Amino acid sequence: MEKRVVIAVILSIAVLYAYSMIFPPPQKKDVVKPGPVPQSQTAPVQAVSSTSVLPAIMQQGNVSVRDLVVETDLFTAVFSTRGAGLKKLVLKRYKETSGPGGREVVLVNEEAAEKFSLLTEGKSFGIEPTVVYNSISNGLKLAGNEKGTLEFTSTSPTGIVFKKSYIFTGNDYRIDLHQELLNNSPTKFDGSLHLIGNNRIEAKPGDGRFEVYGPVTLADDKINTEKVADFSKGPKQYDKNILWTAFADKYFMNAILSDNNSIAAVRLAKVNTNYLQDDVSSPPLALNPGQSAAVNYRIFYGPKDLEILKGQGSRLEEAIDFGWFSALAKPLLRTLKFFYSYTHNYGIAIIIITVILKLLFFPLTHKSYKSMKEMQKLQPKMAELKEKFKNDRDAMNRAVMDLYKTHKVNPMGGCLPMIVQIPVFFALYKALMFSIELRHAPFMLWIMDLSAKDPYYVTPVIMGVTMFVQQKMTPSNMDPVQAKMMLALPVVFTFMFLNFPSGLVLYWLVNNILTIAQQTYINKSLPS
């Protein structure tokens, strides 16, 4: 979708300016013809001295399988003593649909133990991912700044005592995961812990939420985004300077974040047609008899909200792909949210920010239009020069440049001011296209979700009409073929925008209306 927008905009600019504003009309008698990632040293996991003693732990024996429910202001999570894994997680502030009775967004929902998330495996220590843990917890209900902990403990057949602790805060999506091992055996053990996440592949054709879908990893100071389809070729692995790994769609994500260099490697693999697994490895651990070690992570399950992700640290906000113009998209999104705080309507906020951008760029637009007018006045003389030097292109170019110099006209004066605005356009496009704030946000009348297409296609059609009017107001000296090409652009844009988010169409529509008003004013203010 984004590629189509880029191509269409570049095409329209090229046609508008290259033919109608700069070059003279054609004369009838003159035809111008991933590979393996290198290994790197990883920082050691935080060691716990041998004087640190874990609580007395029962052997697994007949420990029963139980579900423990954690309810906060933001989500409801269900953990199982089977693997001390995450069985279900539901976001309380987001719905699957915008209408009444919509179900809450479910990020995890599994019944089979081997498909739980946040399972821990350590074969060298005898830790199996689906072992049944002991827990004295009975669930948690937290609000505001309240904190609570779920603790799970188990002893492996090798004599390794293992404890998993999940720490929650009532008003935060962050979950702190602390894992501690104690070697109660007379034998030294060496190895790594693996934290396993199972991600169900459930992309639905036509569902805007899954336009962006798959793993994202920040490794070696670079965002690595993978498509689910690419894993049919084999797994992906990262093992250098990993800050976090995540699985995301357009609006929501889950992530495992490093805590004190606790991620040594990440392996991503498609285990079957329905699941993609991330395997997060700790740095090497060496446990002498009586010694302990800890491996900690930060866990995130929640919305891809710019401010929320930034608050998690570790550059997690970079999971939102704002493209090349991220430095512009982020402040534009914050500005949009600022206006929403006063209007309580993102549609009105979009209109306000569009008006402000038009006012800011008015001097450039005025200069551009004035330059185009001056270029038009020179068209007859340029045609004469072209006829005069039709057999000597170099001489013609020199004569044209002398003409520009004599009349103090910059041939790029009409284009450059418009080119300056292109980064702002694409930045705002990205901000609107991938903003969770617009998800299920109503505007007015029939538009009840600015992240979804206009259900009756009214705004795209009106947008196409305004493009046609705007085109007619732009003076040109095109031949019939070029004129037909230009007439096709509004039609192409209209069909292209039929399935675009209505918030983005609203921006373009308002921008077109303001451009028409602006051109009307400039036409009246400039001499003929």
Swiss-Prot record:
The keyword Transcription does not apply. The keyword Protein transport applies. InterPro entries: Membr_insert_YidC, Membr_insert_YidC_N, YidC/ALB3/OXA1/COX18, YidC/Oxa/ALB_C, YidC_ALB_C, YidC_periplasmic_sf. Pfam families: 60KD_IMP (PF02096), YidC_periplas (PF14849). It comes from the Bacteria. Keywords: Cell inner membrane, Cell membrane, Chaperone, Membrane, Protein transport, Transmembrane, Transmembrane helix, Transport. The chain crosses the membrane at residues 5-25, 346-366, 416-436, 486-506. GO terms for biological process: protein insertion into membrane; protein transport. Its main location: membrane. Disulfide bonds: none annotated. GO terms for molecular function: membrane insertase activity. It is found in: Cell inner membrane. It is a multi-pass membrane protein. GO terms for cellular component: plasma membrane. PANTHER family: CYTOCHROME C OXIDASE ASSEMBLY PROTEIN COX18, MITOCHONDRIAL, OXA1. Interacts with the Sec translocase complex via SecD. Specifically interacts with transmembrane segments of nascent integral membrane proteins during membrane integration. Required for the insertion and/or proper folding and/or complex formation of integral membrane proteins into the membrane. Involved in integration of membrane proteins that insert both dependently and independently of the Sec translocase complex, as well as at least some lipoproteins. Aids folding of multispanning membrane proteins. Belongs to the OXA1/ALB3/YidC family. Type 1 subfamily. This is Membrane protein insertase YidC. It comes from Geotalea uraniireducens (strain Rf4) (Geobacter uraniireducens).
